[in-house]
């Protein structure tokens, strides 16, 4: 099966004299997988996600996403690649409060050169799919946490990315909103979206994972399929 992510001997050191924060690590993620990354604080989860997202560069090794070795791209090329191929969802939404829901969602498409009409059509399609069309002209500050996270997911998907990265997407939500976002991630995976999810929430991990890796001190301590670490 096609590999969306390939990490080849990847290590990241923040202190040249200390142990790596991550790795060395060799890991592949196949198209359509929902990979959940768990582990204690400081285990390397955020470092792994940042390397895959191209938000940081490895000290050693190769990071290949959607067939491109992103650790060797220039900053300009990397930013363009990220906009086109990687969608990201964070704990605190990162929406622009002075833009409407529709404008927030279609902005990444416009940044990649998509025409306004086509971007608006894609935003409308996603709002319908995610159950937020009634909020099209609203501003994010008027929405609940769960609704804002749905807007963030729609924005992440607007360019039809090969990969969706989610970092503690329910961490700032109440229980009901968290369940809504969990169900949304499950539905996206069932529709074939490749997902990498970092979470401390065992229930979220169990619901979403087709595969789970558990990190300890920057290394994979456990790699399991069709079940989550509890």
Language-model segments: what does each one mean?
Residues 3-209, 214-216:
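ABC family nucleotide-binding domain
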Residues 77, 219, 227:
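Residue-level detector of flexible, active-site-proximal loop/helix-junction positions
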Residues 1-11, 222-230:
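ABC-family P-loop ATPase nucleotide-binding domain
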